[in-house]
Amino acid sequence: MEPAERAGGRDPLEPGGRPGPDPQGFVPQKEIVYNKLLPYAERLDAESDLQLAQIKSNLGRAVQLQELWPGGLFWTRKLSTYHRLYGRKFSKEDHVLFIKLLYELVSIPKLEISMMQGFARLLINLLKKKELLSRDDLELPWRPLYDMVERILYSKTEHLGLNWFPNSVENVLKTLVKSCRPYFPADATAEMLEEWRPLMCPFDVTMQKAITYFEIFLPTSLPPELHHKGFKLWFDELIGLWVSVQNLPQWEGQLVNLFARLATDNIGYIDWDPYVPKVFTRILRSLNLPVGSSQVLVPRFLTNAYDIGHAVVWITAMMGGPSKLVQKHLAGLFNSITSFYHPSNNGRWLNKLMKLLQRLPNSVVRRLHRERYKKPSWLTPVPDSHKLTDQDVTDFVQCIIQPVLLAMFSKTGSLEAAQALQNLALMRPELVIPPVLERTYPALETLTEPHQLTATLSCVIGVARSLVSGGRWFPEGPTHMLPLLMRALPGVDPNDFSKCMITFQFIATFSTLVPLVDCSSVLQERNDLTEVERELCSATAEFEDFVLQFMDRCFGLIESSTLEQTREETETEKMTHLESLVELGLSSTFSTILTQCSKEIFMVALQKVFNFSISHIFETRVAGRMVADMCRAAVKCCPEESLKLFVPHCCGVITQLTMNDDVLNEEELDKELLWNLQLLSEITRVDGKKLLLYREQLVKILQRTLHLTCKQGYTLSCNLLHHLLRSTTLIYPTEYCSVPGGFDKPPSEYFPIKDWGKPGDLWNLGIQWHVPSSEEVAFAFYLLDSFLQPELIKLQRCGDGELEMSRDDVLQSLTIVHNCLIGSGNLLPPLKGEPVTNLVPSMVSLEETKLYTGLEYEIDLSRENYRETIARVIRKLLNHILNNSEDDTKSLFLIIKIIGDLLQFQGSHKHEFDSRWKSFNLVKKSMENRLHGKKQHIRALLIDRVMLQHELRTLTVEGCEYKKIHQEMIRDLLRLSTSSYSQVRNKAQQTFFAALGAYNFCCRDIIPLVLGFLRPDRQDVTQQQFKGALYCLLGNHSGVCLANLHDWDCIVQTWPAIVSSGLSQAMSLEKPSIVRLFDDLAEKIHRQYETIGLDFTVSKSCVGIAELLQQSKNPSINQTMLSSEEIKEGLKRQQGRNVDALRNYENLVNTLLDGVEQRNLPWKFEHIGIGLLSLLLRDDRVLPLRAIRFFVENLNHDAIVVRKMAISAVAGILKQLKRTHKKLTISPYEISGYPKPTQIVAGDRPDNHWLHYDSKSIPRTKKEWESSCFVEKTHWGYYTWPQNMVVYAGVEEQPKLGRSREDLTEAEQIIFDHFSDPKFVEQLITFLSLEDRKGKDKFNPRRFCLFKGIFRNFDDAFLPVLKPHLERLVADSHESTQRCVAEIIAGLIRGSKHWTFEKVEKLWELLCPLLRTALSNITVETYNDWGTCIATSCESRDPRKLHWLFELLLESPLSGEGGSFVDACRLYVLQGGLAQQEWRVPELLHRLLKYLEPKLTQVYKNVRERIGSVLTYIFMIDVSLPNTAPTASPRVPEFTARILEKLKPLMDVDEEIQNHVMEENGIGEEDERTQGIKLLKTILKWLMASAGRSFSTAVAEQLQLLPLFFKIAPVENDNSYDELKRDAKLCLSLMSQGLLYPHQVPLVLQVLNQTARSSSWHARYTVLTYLQTMVFYNLFIFLNNEDAVKDIRWLVISLLEDEQLEVREMAATTLSGLLQCNFLTMDSPMQIHFEQLCKTKLPKKRKRDPGFVGDTIPSAELVKRHAGVLGLGACVLSSPYDVPTWMPQLLMNLSAHLNDPQPIEMTVKKTLSNFRRTHHDNWQEHKQQFTDDQLLVLTDLLVSPCYYA
């Protein structure tokens, strides 16, 4: 079936296009091309037109009638299915209408969340191919999406349990925004910036929110003429922000994602060059590689690191263009990290490195595809100036190939490397494939390292296609194929599973790509061949040999895997998992080889496999299956020749062996008989037409063997029957050869070498289909009449009780029935019958769609409809068995299978289809060509895809009409699911779940039946039935969960039933399995529940589009437009639905309450019921009063679980009852009296100064309070003011406070009564101050919300009752009482937000003494809770309202009362409050700093640490971000200047600083130096604390402290050091990892140079360790500055000549590291310099006195000479994994110094020993670099005794 016609003028590679004037009247957007290749393709247009017309008409109707459910959902689901079956086969106009309609539906504000998700997923699919619709075709607004994201992802009520969203909702929404983004209007960018800029306050969580919104919403694909309305509005601002942030806050990674997207969408329109060094430095830092001698990682560097995927996209998009800067840096990046890829390295960072390797080539290939091969569309093309040139591609491949080759052998496996190589080989095969082969050939030879073999083979598989197709860049590629294949054969090894599997994959891959045809004869006939072609021709003579050797290997494998005798005895019919994988590998590889063979080679192979199979007798479990598979593969390739050999032989043997009738009744059959039956049953799985010749013989065999007594025998015979039926009735391709028409052509016409590696041509695929002929159908029915009919008659009589059958006979009959059913599933039409009506009311037709799958079901009434007959008989039999012999489980298992297949099976099983689809995708991925695209897959793969398309159609069953017959069978399954045997139940339940998913609305019919088993009033339910019913409710992991259908009608029944089932007599909590079931049920309901809608209103805009959709022509069905009556009726029904929903909701709540309040309900069920009730809290309805009362009473329940649920619930109820507060719009500029700034200035400006805390003007009187304009949210005004700035209106306009009981609503009265009752409150407080889990309890936000709600809704009504409790609790220092009072106080302070001034003032009169007491009673266990309490109290509150609190906390935090610990705690609590206030309290921060500064010399360690942390927060606001005004809060430079003044005494001293301070306050004045050391300790704590927290590091200021730290830091790792030294070391480690700005580099180097001249060798040593980390973590920033590189080089080389040995050695280590990461290069001046030093003459040895041990100070000459040797040694060690050209000579030079005095001799030995260690692995390779003489010297050195000395 070839699509002959192609539309004129279309690109021939784009299938589609109909000839001439379009018969369908529309041009499809983009069809699934594979449909055109199906054998029945000509029928599909009419079919799809009809379906599309129905969808448009009915979906339009449903929406106009406001019927979202069931009509709307039903037809949107149909649209999804349509999309899966035909692609986007609709006109552009319809496409736009569908999108607009779904967009409107998705954005209905009160839409139920599960519907929203359904619509959103469909909309995402419709928007997926953005090239199909341009911005002119479609425009979508952005605000509805923003409202939705805000409402759902930033929900204000979700945390209170008033809304339940599924976990998937975040991804769905983000993808939806991403899909709509290209279509946002041109002005969207400006509107978005206006909306979200005000959130950009870097100290606040809102910053994260702003950047998230920018990342997901900002459109970046606008055309160039609109760039001024797009990214140009924000690029400089955001990139400026990114460049200046130093400490990796969470949102930095999101900015990177945004820039990556921007860069990809606008290649060539943005100049990235100024940022390139910074980008690469940050990406390198993001890999978190371990560097330097001692490293401590900042934890947030790990958690907030960039996503490698996005970083890669960014790099790829910046490549190319005139400057080549990116390529230079990329090469630098790989140079610096290559050695980390070496297989000997491993760590948590390795995954990132591997991902980088895998993603980069992939990303470059995608870019090349887009620039060179992709069809142009409306999206902006890349300008020619910036397209990647061939040179760019070559440079890229060269810079990445080294690490990729190293990664082949990585510890994590070779997958990433193989994927990288696949993409690299597409671009530059000549650079990539040779080195891979160089590693592969030795790996194929090695016997000791099998992992090398698996790694190299999987990489060669990746490059196979590029290798075989050769092409002009790599013409010699194909010549490697045969040598590789021959060498791979030994890999078929029975003793090594993984080697075996990869070898199979390898051989299969290559043979798929190449016709195995011997072309050597062509050499004589033609003389126009190229050199390579001649070589290939002569090589192909080996193909036959290869095929035969492969077969011998397989035979060996089979013979070694024969079942051992021991296993033969047991009834294991299954192979082990590994055996079945080998079987699969073997059979698919062999079948691939035979498919690709020439006829000559095939005949030889056929004969060989035939001889092997008849000369042995195999057991049928393992070896037999493998041989039979090989035979089947042979027969499939050439049925005629093969069947001639096999069928007569097998039939003969079987007939011979069954001559004697005794055989029929034997329990154990002859092995030979079984083996031949097995063989025969497998070789009949071939083209049905070819089998017809042998039908008489085959039928005879069936007659002889179907009724054998031996189960193994008749099972094989049934297989034969099954395969005969399948072969004759199914539609399938009969060959998968790589070239259409096969290779059987004379060499003169056809030259196979031209077809090596050739892709299939979609247009001339020439699939050979097997379509059942009438003769075959007749034969199939003949088989059914002969073999199925008699069994059905027997079973029918057995079911009626007329015929006694033994169990074995029943099983045999059922086996025959089952095999007939699955053999002819395609022939038998689906079950027909009456539909089950009245399940759901709908005004739209809910009809099922019929798909044509290649067979007309015969109207021929003479033929029995066996599906219905089987159904009838099996149901009768089932009934009989369940009533009379329920323990016949084997028969029941089969009956379950039969029922499942009767319902669903039409020729293929879903799970098999899914796994084939998966493996199709894997093969596609492993061999696809992403560079050229255009579906250039090999032919076999394309055929497979068309076949999958056919199967997809046969499996499209969802949305089937639910008929009476289905109902009966599902009820049978339910009966089996609740029967006595657990295995029967389990199997029945799986089939039951599958059936429930297939039929529309059948769940509603079945639920009452399932719940029947749980009813407490039934006495006849057994425990097994009870358990079975619970499992039926629970569902399996993929299917429907009956307990939790998102539908009021259903959960109104199921939830109460689950709770009341606790009273059923079948329920027993003694049985752990039942307890576990209830736990699972409750857990699953909680996990899957999503808030169900109460309001199903459809917006006007939806209805308008729906009308257009219904009127849309081409295609359309004649359906009349809706009358106004219908529309009225629709509206009425929709209002009815809202009323019903509400009634159901209240019903459910009441029924659950009835259930929970039953007298003797076990506690477990009470808990489950309360849990379900708490799911029913909503934000659009207040809970019914009875439930409110229930929850409030349960605050004092005996069980803590219940109390916890009640606390959450009451907090939620209080939120429901919250009264709205009125807001007004203000103008901040008028209030401040300053005009609006002309450009953006963030931070402290005149127009936001009035928000600051100012003790001179805080509102202390009622008048001042009421005239103040309070702004509660801390971020407003920092960056910019919002367009519409709202604040709360004055007190008199707000809801009334101080209400009496009469003023309250009923719901409020319930709460009021309980909380005014002293007894109730006392009990509550007692419970709340109990300990829950010792040592694990923390401040509980739920309880805080409860109290906040109480004081917000009822202001101070309950204070009188609570006051005595608070006073009592505060005085009690127990952990749990303190925590309780902290929670209440936080709730009080936050709840008093809208109180009047008098009430607030009275509140603080009460609170201040309480807090003073509390802070003096603070303990180790509670300081965290008080910190949380104060932080929570200050969060999002105007600081001017809290002045009492701040003044209290600042009274004198370090009074010393209560000891140092209480001081530290007070500071902690204060810090919590101030940190929440961020930038709005500069005055308080200044006061605090002034107070702390004199106390920085505090002796106590805990206070010092706390002060350090407080300083971090004080200076947090001093940020160096762009467009930010200098801060009014304290600034670091001024502070540092004052500190340095005090540290002067330490700076001037040059010797080591020892820590002489004892940890106690000495008496009298301490000297300046001791004071200085104490100060220094605190400063260290401050610097360490701020390393991970602040946004920018004040480098200039810290630098002045560096020399001091260098002096203190210890050199060795020793934990016994005092705190000062440890801290100095840690602080240096953290500082060295800091990100530097380019202008800071010279400052740092200046300090390092100065310290390198210090007299303390500790300082000189530490300079080097600092340098190692600093350079690596700022690599490209330094490389970008030539002077800096020179300075560093000079610094390290000069320290090589230090008088102190340790410093010299560290300098050598540093040099070697800098060389290794390619920061410095080993050039000749350096080499000459070291060689000169080496030649320094040493002074003559003096005669020594016997008592004289040796020179203490080495002579200057010795130091110089040692420096030279160290330098050379550093060069050698800088290449641990290879041998550069200069190395052999250096090693020779070094060896000359083996006899020098110490420490030189030691250095040489160390160097040689390290060289040997690192180069030992690949010594064979490295040896090549040395001359013979050098090798002699070297071998001598490496093994000579002196080496071991």
UniProtKB/Swiss-Prot annotation:
One of its GO terms (biological process) is proteasomal ubiquitin-independent protein catabolic process. HEAT repeats lie at residues 475-519, 1000-1039, 1181-1219, 1356-1394, 1638-1676, 1682-1720. Its main location: cytoplasm. Residues 1-26 are annotated as: Disordered. This is Proteasome activator complex subunit 4. Residues 1652-1740 are annotated as: Bromodomain-like (BRDL). SUPFAM superfamilies: ARM repeat. Homodimer. Component of the spermatoproteasome, a form of the proteasome specifically found in testis. Interacts with the 20S and 26S proteasomes. InterPro entries: ARM-like, ARM-type_fold, Blm10_mid, HEAT_PSME4, PSME4, PSME4_C. Belongs to the BLM10 family. Pfam families: HEAT_PSME4, HEAT_PSME4_mid, PSME4_C. The modification Phosphoserine is found at S1123, S1616. The keyword Phosphoprotein applies. Residues 1-13 have a biased composition (Basic and acidic residues). Keywords: Cytoplasm, Developmental protein, Differentiation, DNA damage, DNA repair, Nucleus, Phosphoprotein, Proteasome, Repeat, Spermatogenesis. It is found in: Cytoplasm, Cytosol; Nucleus; Nucleus speckle. Gene3D superfamilies: Leucine-rich Repeat Variant. The bromodomain-like (BRDL) region specifically recognizes and binds acetylated histones. It comes from the Eukaryota. Associated component of the proteasome that specifically recognizes acetylated histones and promotes ATP- and ubiquitin-independent degradation of core histones during spermatogenesis and DNA damage response. Recognizes and binds acetylated histones via its bromodomain-like (BRDL) region and activates the proteasome by opening the gated channel for substrate entry. Binds to the core proteasome via its C-terminus, which occupies the same binding sites as the proteasomal ATPases, opening the closed structure of the proteasome via an active gating mechanism. The keyword Repeat applies. Phosphorylated. One of its GO terms (molecular function) is proteasome binding. One of its GO terms (cellular component) is spermatoproteasome complex.
